[in-house]
Structures are given as structure tokens and as C-alpha cells.
Amino acid sequence: MIETAQAFGVDIGGSGIKAAPVDLTKGDFAEPRLKILTPEVSTPQAVAKIVKQQLDHFEVPESAPVGIAFPAPIKPGQKLDFMANLDQSWIGVDVTEVFSEACGRPVVVVNDADAAGLAEVQFGAAKGQDGLVIATTLGTGIGTALIYNGVLIPNTELGHIILSAKHLDAEKYASSAIRENEELGYKKWAKRLTKYYGLMEKYFNPDLFTVGGGVSRQSEK
């Protein structure tokens, strides 16, 4: 059962949907997370059904805040106009409305990389950092969040800049999923990532990069 000093967080990705109660004072899981594979046909109805299952699993009370990190640009009150890593039927949908109706309660939906960036500033490697922070997440795609003096610049989607001679965008050239699909060794993948981060350095000259996402589990490599 979730407690009053906690919220319930959901991270929707192209390969998995992860959820857990979160301790708002520590910025950490209050209970072990529950991961359910993203449906092969990841329509709004199919994904929202899984989020409701996760809420029920943790017996989340009506009073608990629910936040959902979603892999697309999110503009409050507007319908989705872009989708890279879930079913294209999401385009034209009010994402917040879909999840609120499925869960039977208000929810807050934000871009997944923006959520990661705000967490880094509040609890992680970027805490207390002045100037420009570029938080990146490496997983099915490449997510980015720009935070300047603690203020989020939302929905940057810099994982879609053109990076290769074949006119591939960055996440189709250097994401963690591409490393797995092309069976790249870590040294070869690191060269691709170096190209990406070098371009970001040239364009934005940030004071700090952070790297997170699914790749965090293999950080020593």
C-alpha cells in the first residue's frame, strides 16, 4: 500500500512499462518496481490497460499523485502529433485523457526524458548545477532534456537529429536498442555515441551531460 509521502510513477517505453511507488523525499523506489512488456501492438487502449493493472497491483489509493513518463512530446491540452516508439495510432490522441479515463483518476503525463532530467536536477548528478544541463536517456531511443539554471526547456527531442551519412537520426544510429539489434560491441557503440555527444557539445556547449536510461544497468562497460 502506498503511503502519503509517496507518489506513483510509471515509465512507458518502447520495450517495457515500468511502475512503482516513489519516495518523494529521497527520489527512490519505495517498493520494487513492476515491469510489464510493452504490447507488440502498442495502441492507446493496450498500453493504458497495463498502466491500470500496475495501479491495481500496488493498491494505489485515490489520494496518491500519479505521474506517467511518456515517449513523445507532451503539450498540456493538446493532442499528440508525433510518435516514434509506440503504435502510430497514438497520433491525434489526448494522452492525459486516455490514461485518466483508463485509471479512473487524474494523472500527470510528461515527456519521459523531461521527467528523467527533472529527477537528475532534483536528486541526481545535476543537483545544484548552474548553467545548461543536457540529460540523456539511452534505451529504445535517445531521449533528451535541456535544463537551464534549474528550469526545464520541454520536449527537445534531440535524439532525432540527423547523425549519419545515411541520413539516419541519432536514435536509429546510436541508441541502446540499435547496439543490441546490430550486435555492436561496446567500443564500436561508444564511437557512435561519441559522435552524437560531440555534436551536442558543438551545438549547445552544455555545462554538464548526464547519461541514464536502460543503459545504466551496464554502466561499467
Where are these regions (language model features)?
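Glycine-rich phosphate-binding loop and adjoining helix at the ATP-binding site
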Residues: 32-34, 39-52, 56, 61-66, ...
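Hydrophobic "anchor" residues
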Residues: 16, 28-29, 80, 152
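Glycine-rich phosphate-binding loops at beta-strand->alpha-helix junctions
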Residues: 16, 200, 204-221
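Glycine/GP-enriched mid-protein hinge/lid loop-to-helix segment characteristic of carbohydrate kinases
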Residues: 1-8, 20-24, 31-34, 41-45, ...
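Short coil/turn motifs at secondary-structure junctions
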Residues: 24-26, 73
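Glycine-rich beta-strand-to-loop/alpha-helix junction loops that act as flexible
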Residues: 66-72, 138-140, 207-215
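Asp-based phosphoryl-transfer active-site loop
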Residues: 10-15
